[in-house]
Amino acid sequence: MTAGTTTGTTVGDRAAIALLALSGRALPLLREWVGGDPGCGVARGLLTLATGDRMADSVLKEQLALAHRDARTAGEREASLVYGVFLHTHRQYRLTADHLVTHFERWPADELAGLMIGAFSACEDAAYRALGDTLVERQAALAGPDNWPWTGWLASARAEQGRVREAHDLAERALARYPRSGVAVHALAHAEHELGTGPASTAFLDRWLTADPGAVQVRHLSWHAALQSIACGDFEDARRRADAALPRQDVGMRAATNWRLLLVGQEPAGRSDPEHVRELLTAPGGTAEVFHTFNLALALAVEAATDDLEQLARRAAADPRPDYRDVLAPVVRTLAALTTGRPRAAADELEALGEKAERIGGVRVEREIVQDTLARALVDAGEHVRAADLLHHRTSTRRHHAYEDRLLTARTPAAAAGPG
């Protein structure tokens, strides 16, 4: 496919465009591509990239071996691309990032390689995130402003850097070029969260998702719409959206929604099964990534499972990994303190943590819940002025901030005993 194209004459072109757009048509088209051209290593590699997390290890290994063999026959770029897929599907994110740097030196602005750009942030390392941002900036400049995939990725980078207006403009530019760009609409959702756009954002997301209900990000974008409803104080709509879009086993986004609701004294949406949460924590991948573990902790906090939280905090404090020991442990202790009505202790934990809280993982919109938690703890501890200062940048710049106003509202002693 040519750079920034919006249509394709071959099934391969259409599949690549759908995958770049995170369309619900991507998987059927990729399967059609592989079925019609089983010797195309890139086709098989991209299908494996899209579905590898659901494959058994033996199947994953077999598909990647076939893809790389055929890609080597096609050429060096194809072989390099599939090798990147091999690294990415094996969660070797640092190696993936290092490989992408070399790949882009040889094949600048390669859109299909851009599908793996998330490896830089997945490294959970500030230096790699910065390297990824620099790489995206360079590739977007080389690709030009009419290239919707790279403009969308640049919009995402700008949103995460807090350059919200620029992110918004870039996302709109990408969507003007290709209205079905899932990357661009996701970047727009992040920007509009920080702008407090409210009903205008939810209406746009509803229209966009109606056109492709099978879109890859349907649940995540529905979650963004629920957050906009929370921002406006329409808590019933937030619950409705969460229950309609998020299955009970989707612990992370459901917990992040429910904890926000509880922080402002509202009933949560449907909850996750606590036993399922405990099973996830004890599973081999339960503490593999700090942000995943944090989301499980939020789910426990929603249930006021103080004993589980304290046990998890001790486990994190004994972990040799700095982000677990120095960041996750105090955050989990904060949640435990709030569930037992000890806001002063909770506030002390988070204030001592300071900017290190950024290392909890996730993106800005997701990490904001840590600040929400500190604001609630400060208000419940009688520190309203400090809480207001903490949220001033939000209440003074967001069009809709009913949620922040609720966070800054003192609760009755009974309600202040803790979320849950």
What are these regions (language model features)?
Residues 55, 91, 125-127, 162, ...:
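Residue-level detector of the short coil/turn that links helix A to helix B
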Residues 227-420:
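Helix-coil-helix junctions within alpha-helical repeat/solenoid scaffolds
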Residues 32-33, 67-70, 102-103, 135-139, ...:
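Canonical positions in the second alpha-helix
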Residues 6-11, 38-42, 74-80, 107-114, ...:
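Generic helix N-cap/helix-start motif at coil->alpha-helix transitions
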Residues 26, 60, 96, 128-132, ...:
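Single-residue signature of alpha-solenoid repeat helices
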